[in-house]
Amino acid sequence: MLDIKYADISALIKKKISDFHYKNEIIESGIIINIGDGVANVYGLFNAIYGEIVEFENGLKGIVLNLEEENVGIILIGSSKGIKEGDKVIRTGMISSINVGECMLGRVINSLGVPIDGKGPIYGNLFLMPLERKAPGVIYREPVIEPLQTGIKCIDSMIPIGRGQRELIIGDRQTGKTTLAIDTIINQKKFYDMGNPVYCIYVSIGKKASTIASIVKLLEENDALSYTVILTANASDSAAMQVFAPFSGTAIGEFFRDTGRSALIIYDDLSKQAVAYREISLLLRRPPGREAYPGDIFYLHSRLLERSSKIISDNKIASKMNDVPKSIEKKILGGGSLTSLPIIETQFGDVSSYIPTNVISITDGQIFLETNLFNSGIRPAINEGISVSRVGASAQIKSMKKISGTFKLDQAQFRELESFSQFGSDLDSTTKNIIEKGKRNIEILKQSINSPYRLGYQIAIIYAGTNNLLKEIPLNKVKFFEKKYLNYLNDKYSSIIDLLEEGEINENIFSILNNVALKIINKFFN
């Protein structure tokens, strides 16, 4: 028989009792008083926070958007099927957030970060980032001095974009806005291959699923999906998903920015987000303002776009940045940037309506696309006269800045004289020369879709245009000259192209570019 020591048993029981801590878990809940159109009014959540996630009885999540004296207004993230008046709603204490990480690259996700591309779950290191976050303070920012190459001749020469800038793409439907953005993503491949990637986030709002599928296929064909995250809220998704899609995309971009890397985010387009936000605001019974938009529609876009910035290079200062999420506190590095290209759709070219004027005033410049130019075969259909980049010029490399210095002015002068020439046929030789030069420059700026140009090629052909080397070439042969000219430079003077991309420019390079142009002209046009 075992020798049982009752003293030991007594001591063990006492220890277990002393180690036991009973903890009351307080769960705050409320009751749905009415629900409809994706919005629920709930009584009882007196301590709810704006932007907090709440959970319904069937597991569906919602976000608190209205805080009133007696109840809170909640938008549902998903279908309201199975939810009814009298159901319980529980606070989670969590602010709306999304899991982000490098493992998201190459995937298609929704506004909640859930993959929808049929490739299974996302595996890897993920970090929780809030959807809503304060923009970096002034002391944590640096001036925009590093270029973001788009590969589009008209933009890189006359409307340059810098890393950390916010440049609006604006125009009517079917003028090539999305194409400009996708071409910019494709052009980042060479930087990815060189080990200095610009990670891209393409946020689609209110588009058809078939359109997204074609964009994914296009990026795959150009090997651009490996450094891109596609976040989509389709036309069939709820208004809430469309409103929060840009915020989710920005959280992903901020992860790359705050860990010392460069990122580019495209919002396609914020007009549809504004419409979805108007729908939610009206359902929440907020007072409508101009064009029935709520009073805080400007704040919706300003707080979103202000988060795009160039972070200071000093790691010590960057580590103290305001409002850093705890999940990435130890990964903060300086020198990162988040560049944004918001897209706005106009109606009949009217840039003076409410949403376009709001976003123009928030951003650092705009690229305006015109239907008339598009229909006349000038593609990309950029009106360089009213397009502007307010901070990008300081980020332009030396060689491009020197060669394209008078380019925009020349084209503006050409536009003015061209319209004037329609009223009379008697023009002096100087005016005729300006018009002929302008027409050839327009031919130079034309570009096929999904075919971004190397920076060195851009500089070389723009040099030929600005120095009037094409004056003897027929207008319909300018593209033929361009092809032969760039091929010859690539075959015989590839080192010159490399020097131009490094910012080098001198009389020797000018001489080579002149001689090559003359050789091509003498061979094919004389």
UniProtKB/Swiss-Prot annotation:
Keywords carried by this UniProt record: ATP synthesis, ATP-binding, Cell membrane, CF(1), Hydrogen ion transport, Ion transport, Membrane, Nucleotide-binding, Translocase, Transport
* Subcellular localization(s) per the UniProt record: Cell membrane
Question: Could you name the Gene Ontology cellular component terms for this entry?
Answer: plasma membrane; proton-transporting ATP synthase complex
Write out the catalysed reaction.
ATP + H2O + 4 H(+)(in) = ADP + phosphate + 5 H(+)(out)
Q: How does it sit in the membrane?
A: Peripheral membrane protein
Q: Where are the transmembrane segments?
A: none
Check the record and name the PROSITE patterns matching this protein.
Answer: ATPASE_ALPHA_BETA
EC assignment: 7.1.2.2
Instruction: Enumerate the InterPro entries for this protein.
Output: ATP_synth_asu-like_sf, ATP_synth_asu_C, ATP_synth_asu_C_sf, ATP_synth_F1_a_nt-bd_dom, ATP_synth_F1_asu, ATPase_a/bsu_AS, ATPase_F1/V1/A1_a/bsu_N, ATPase_F1/V1/A1_a/bsu_N_sf
Its domain of life?
Answer: Bacteria
Say if the entry is tagged with keyword Cell wall biogenesis/degradation. no
Identify the residues that bind ATP: G171, D172, R173, Q174, T175, G176, K177, T178
Please indicate if the UniProt record lists Coiled coil as a keyword. no
Where does the entry annotate site (Required for activity)? S387
Its EC top class is translocase
Q: Sorted alphabetically, which Gene3D superfamilies does this protein's record hold?
A: 2.40.30.20, ATP synthase alpha/beta chain, C-terminal domain, P-loop containing nucleotide triphosphate hydrolases
| A GO term, aspect molecular function | ATP binding
Q: How does it assemble?
A: F-type ATPases have 2 components, CF(1) - the catalytic core - and CF(0) - the membrane proton channel. CF(1) has five subunits: alpha(3), beta(3), gamma(1), delta(1), epsilon(1). CF(0) has three main subunits: a(1), b(2) and c(9-12). The alpha and beta chains form an alternating ring which encloses part of the gamma chain. CF(1) is attached to CF(0) by a central stalk formed by the gamma and epsilon chains, while a peripheral stalk is formed by the delta and b chains.
**Function summary:** Produces ATP from ADP in the presence of a proton gradient across the membrane. The alpha chain is a regulatory subunit.
Indicate the family of this protein. Answer: Belongs to the ATPase alpha/beta chains family.
Among PANTHER family, the record links this protein to:
ATP SYNTHASE SUBUNIT ALPHA, MITOCHONDRIAL
Question: NCBIfam families, alphabetically?
Answer: atpA, PRK13343.1
Name the record gives this protein: ATP synthase subunit alpha
Q: Which organism is it from?
A: Karelsulcia muelleri (strain GWSS) (Sulcia muelleri)
